[in-house]
Amino acid sequence: MKAEIISVGTELLLGQITDTNRPYIARALHDMGIESYHQSIVGGNAADILTTLRLAAHRSDLIILIGGLGPAVDDLTKQVVSQFINSSLIPDTEALRKLKKWHDAVDVEMADNNYRQVLFLEQGKPLKNDFGFAVGSFYQSNDGPDFLLMPGPPWEMVPMFDHYVVPLLERQYLHGQVLNSLVMRYFGIGESRLSQLISDLMISQTNPTMTTDAKKHEVTIRLTSKASSEALAENLNQKAAAKINTLVGDYFYGYGAHNSLEKVVANLLEENQQTIAMTEVFTRGLVQSTLQNALSQTETLAGGFNGMSALLDLTDDEIELSGDNGAQLVSRLAQLTQQRLGADIGLAILAETPESNGQHDYVNEKVWFGLVSHQERLLVTSQSFAKDHQDNVEDAIFVALDLIRRHLSQQNLVDRA
């Protein structure tokens, strides 16, 4: 099954709007086992749309067009497709009722061209638009490709696709199979290294499929399985996840497409009823603020300091931090932080003097992390960063969060991979 995705809109061609719709749909199609080998953008010109359709019809089984369903003069997608497949356009009565009701409610006379939005391909299926007026269409052909038409605004397209199109495609093309996706999240390992470690599994594993995705501070693996029931599909994913984590489990921190490292740490702190205090000389309170956004209990954060002078009888400038005394100083600072603020956990983050590495604004910064708890567990680690200072700070925030997570999960520290 091959699908082709075509975005329609002159504003896309001119770079005035970034097209987020095509990648969103392509990822979802891949998860369903429907591959998209061709994608394109075409302006709102009837001749250009028709030329693109002729090419797509020769090489694809499903042609997906996004945009051009509105009331404007250059919203021509439905009209060109109806001409191409020799079908009429008819109004969707429910959508027309919604459109008229809205105009009555705001006491505005409806312009005639608004009527175009509620038209869909005759003998096709109208697709409901919960956040707009432009109706989508799904049309199955007996002797050519099928057509799927959706509105261009992402806030209309995404809900339509998720709520109505995905179930429709599953019924039409998956033949009773159920899809289940599982997202696994990893921190402290790069995509290239992770892919290398699980490469044999990725090659041999066909159900579920495995795809990796590099985020700014982490890597995710998406597993997508097909089975005759939701329970069987979920079981396939869980078995594959267990195999993956025998290889890279040291870096695994959680499941879920909308999960995050700070959410996991916040949950662990609250579940274990632990309070934490921090001295952030390098990150200047950003670990606390990041964590605070994920916490439901504000008392979990016992407070903190952005400098060492409040805890030591020296100013920050008078303390010379180096590899010789970094571990000792950050350990002492974590202990003092915990004691002074009466927390279960004390965390300290310090950095050695940065050095320019001669590349733009990049600087080499070695950062020390220390964590101490009432259980007399002491974790100390250091990491070198070599981006611009702000990026180094952002990276350090997540290293600190992972240190807290490893303490609460009773996991050992591992080297960055």
Curated annotation (Swiss-Prot):
InterPro entries: CinA, CinA-like_C, CinA_C, CinA_KH, Competence-induced_CinA, MoaB/Mog-like_dom_sf, MoaB/Mog_dom. It comes from the Bacteria. It holds the Pfam family CinA. Belongs to the CinA family. This is Putative competence-damage inducible protein. It comes from Leuconostoc citreum (strain KM20).
